[in-house]
From Swiss-Prot:
Protein name as annotated: Interleukin-12 subunit alpha
Sequence similarity: Belongs to the IL-6 superfamily.
Keywords: Cytokine, Disulfide bond, Glycoprotein, Growth factor, Secreted, Signal
Annotated source species: Marmota monax
One GO-annotated biological process of the protein: immune response
Annotated GO MF terms: cytokine activity; growth factor activity; interleukin-12 receptor binding
Subunit structure: Heterodimer with IL12B; disulfide-linked. This heterodimer is known as interleukin IL-12. Heterodimer with EBI3/IL27B; not disulfide-linked. This heterodimer is known as interleukin IL-35. Interacts with NBR1; this interaction promotes IL-12 secretion.
């Protein structure tokens, strides 16, 4: 029996985001009904905050390649996590013969966002989301440190964005990992043009990931 149209729509949305430059994995294992609404709300907050931060960067860095048409799109989670695989509904995974496109046939067969017996699969999905956000958090903090060296003070870290990332990380941190507080070690750079360009690239990538996460949480919340 093929999966429902609703599940196929979720899969199509996630795969589309994947090919636009999106999705990887993160943690979660507590009962779905207890946390799905909170995570859904936090994912919506993250998406709106990323949108605001990106728009602000595009306006302030008007002479930099910062728009969607100009930026060199890059996925920092590539080959490290895969949230699409981790969060695939079980009914799709168990009915791979029903998947019409070769583009979807690679998706792992274990993940699930459906209600009921989903604790293990939900843990895998939320783990993937956590790892995604951790990478973006560290990159944002590293860039923020470099922006402090800008004598013009053109643009600084977005505290609201960092807070939104942190809150969602805490909500999906089912493995009780210690949330990193320091940027990843990196050689200092005096090339502020490159740093600001990298900020634009990172914000575009994070927005795509936030859309993916929000759709996953919407599915969980309505299951």
């Amino acid at each position: 029996m093929c999966p429902s149209a609703r599940s196929l729509l979720l899969l199509a949305s996630l795969v589309l985001l994947e090919h636009l430059g999106s999705a990887r994995n993160l943690p979660r294992s507590t009962p779905v009904p207890a946390v799905s609404q909170e995570c859904h709300n936090l994912s919506q907050t993250l998406l709106s905050t990323v949108d605001s931060a990106l728009q602000n960067a595009i306006e302030i860095l008007e002479y930099y390649p910062c728009s969607a048409e100009e930026v060199n799109h890059e996925d920092i989670t590539k080959n490290r996590t895969n949230t699409v695989k981790a969060c695939l509904p079980q009914e799709l995974a168990q009915n791979e013969n029903c998947l019409a496109s070769r583009e979807t046939s690679f998706i792992i067969k274990r993940s699930s966002l459906t209600s009921g017996r989903t604790s293990w699969n939900t843990t895998l999905c939320f783990s993937s989301i956590y790892e995604d956000l951790k990478m973006y958090q560290l990159e944002l903090k590293a860039i923020s440190e470099k922006l402090l060296m800008d004598p013009k003070g053109q643009i600084y870290e977005d505290k609201a964005l960092l807070a939104a990332v942190d809150y969602l990380m805490q909500a999906v941190n089912v493995n009780n990992e210690t949330v990193p507080q320091t940027p990843s070690p990196e050689a200092p750079s005096s090339n502020l043009y490159r740093t600001k360009t990298k900020l634009c690239i990172l914000l575009h990538a994070l927005r795509i990931r936030a859309v993916t996460i929000n759709r996953v949480m919407s599915y969980l919340n309505s299951s």
